[in-house]
Structures are given as C-alpha cells and as structure tokens.
Amino acid sequence: MLREEAILLSLKKLDYLSRSQLQKMHGLSGDRNARKVLDNMKQFISCFRGENRENIYHLNKTGRERVGCEVIRQKTIQAGHYLMRADAYLHYTANEDWRNELKFSVPEVVTVIPDSYFRHYSKRHFLEIDHLQHMNKNREKVDRYKKLYATGVLQKKIGYFPRMVWVTLTVSRKQQLLEWCNGLDVIIHLWDEIK
C-alpha cells in the first residue's frame, strides 16, 4: 500500500512517467514485476504507448482524488516533454525541493516560467526542456532569462542568479543554446546522457 501511494504521489508531482522511470524511482525490480505492480494499480492510473513503445502512466480520476491532485492529465503527444523533465528530476537526485512551472516576475519588465525550479547541492537551478521546440522560442526564453538576470532582483533576494539547466535532443541544438546563454551560468544536457 505504501508503494502504491508513493507511485501515485510521483505521478502527481511529475504528471507523466514511463514504466522504466517508475522502476528507477520506486525500486520495481524487473520488467515483469513492474508491469504486475502497475497493472494492479489500474483503478488509479491510466497509460498509453509512447514513441519508443514503452507505456507512459498518468493519474486517472480516481487516482487524482486519492492523492488530492487537481491537474487533469490525458494522453498527449507532448508526453516526451514531461518524460525529459522526469529524467532531469531523477538525474538531479529526485529533489524534494522540486517545483514545476513556478512563475518569476518583475512587473512590467519580464516574466519567466521555467519548466522546473529546484535546489541541487545548495544551489538553485532553473530547468528548461527543449523537446521539439522551435529554436526561435528557445531564443526568446534565453532573452527573458537575461532580462531577469539584468534586473538583479534574484541576486538581491538569494545572493546569486540560479544556474540554468537545459535538456535537449541534439548536439547542434546544445551548441546553439550554449552560444545564446553566454553570460549565464548554464549546463546543457543531451537527453540521452541523463536517461
């Protein structure tokens, strides 16, 4: 029962998780065992096949009620974005201080909504996921972060500007992001490196 509750809470926090991600997070040894555990939870979770033919799970209505989740998730082609974010969560040691889509705003100057905001080794980080996003949108995001940096608001509040972490799909996109992020403290991962 505790394991079921923990799985439901993970789905509440991260929205969508693949079977392999759930295995890593909750020690579900072996594919058969993982499928059995997740099949026994069908009353609380729904699933669909992802791009790589692996099941992707999310809370259904009963599961949302059980853990007090108000966000409704259904089958979506954007699941890859959420899976990339979940892999970043696992890579950064399943941080309890992890918050998704937290708004940072300096009125009438700039607003930034990172995919996640978290603390790792006592340092704050912004996470941005680049899953099939148009590069001009990524450029706009970087420009907004640079505007936020230029205001000095976060530096005054926490003593420094948080490190930017990007997860992207290709080396060429990584290089372009590195170029644009010049002047910011940034780490850029390829998704395959952190899976």
Which ranges hold each PLM region?
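Active-site metal-binding core of divalent-cation-utilizing nuclease and nuclease-like domains
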Residues: 89-124, 131-140
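Residues that scaffold, gate, or flank divalent-cation-dependent active/transport sites
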Residues: 189-191
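Nuclease-adjacent, charged terminal/linker segments that flank catalytic cores
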Residues: 1-72
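Hydrophobic beta-strand segments of well-ordered beta-sheets in folded domains
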Residues: 116, 121-127, 159-167
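Amphipathic alpha-helical segments that form well-ordered structural scaffolds
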Residues: 21, 87-91, 144, 176
